[in-house]
């Protein structure tokens, strides 16, 4: 598997900025908005890293995104991977989504605008996972051919 170190550095910086924004949360709506959006971004990135961990564990063939500015980390090679690898990569994304929803539910201050915004963004991301990613994984699980999922290639 190719190196994803530059994405790890990028996402670590985003995470640290997010923590700082929550630690220095002021009374303004802007500071709450920034903190909430950054937490939502971290949730999205956590979901993507969940997929990548699944790819690593299953030894799936993936190709890193061409730019550090890409929100997606990689392309899963639909021609080189088997059904089990595809499903493993899908499942670990679902697990990551469940984990960030758990953390958001139990650890964010949901009484604050920042907490509510982060939760709404997280629920929106989870809905995208349920309505877009889950049906594809389900059809592959039921025996359909792995669809072409590459975006960058």
Outline where the language-model segments fall:
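Metalloprotease/metallohydrolase-associated module, dominated by Zn2+-dependent proteases
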Residues: 1-22, 74-153
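Short pre-active-site segment immediately N-terminal to the catalytic Zn-binding motif
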Residues: 24-44
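Short helix-capping/hinge motifs at transmembrane helix termini and TM-loop junctions
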Residues: 25-26, 58-59, 108-109
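Sparse, context-dependent recognition of short Cys/His-centered cofactor- or disulfide-binding micro-motifs
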Residues: 29, 47, 119
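Generic, low-specificity signal for short hydrophobic/alpha-helical stretches with a mild N-terminal bias
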Residues: 31-35, 73, 113
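Small-residue-rich helix-interface/hinge motifs
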Residues: 38-83
């Amino acid at each position: 598997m190719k190196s994803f170190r530059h994405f790890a550095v990028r996402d670590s910086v985003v995470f640290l900025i997010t923590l700082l924004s929550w630690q220095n949360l002021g009374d303004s709506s802007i500071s709450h908005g920034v903190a909430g959006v950054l937490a939502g971004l971290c949730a999205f990135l956590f979901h993507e890293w969940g997929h990548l961990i699944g790819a690593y564990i299953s030894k799936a063939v993936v190709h890193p995104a061409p730019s550090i500015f890409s929100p997606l980390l990689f392309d899963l090679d639909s021609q080189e991977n088997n059904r089990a690898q595809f499903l493993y990569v899908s499942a670990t994304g679902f697990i990551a989504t469940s984990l960030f929803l758990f953390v958001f539910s139990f650890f964010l201050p949901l009484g604050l605008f920042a907490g509510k915004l982060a939760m709404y963004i997280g629920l929106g991301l989870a809905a995208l996972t349920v309505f877009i990613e889950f049906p594809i994984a389900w059809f592959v699980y039921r025996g359909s051919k792995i669809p072409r999922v590459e975006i960058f290639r």
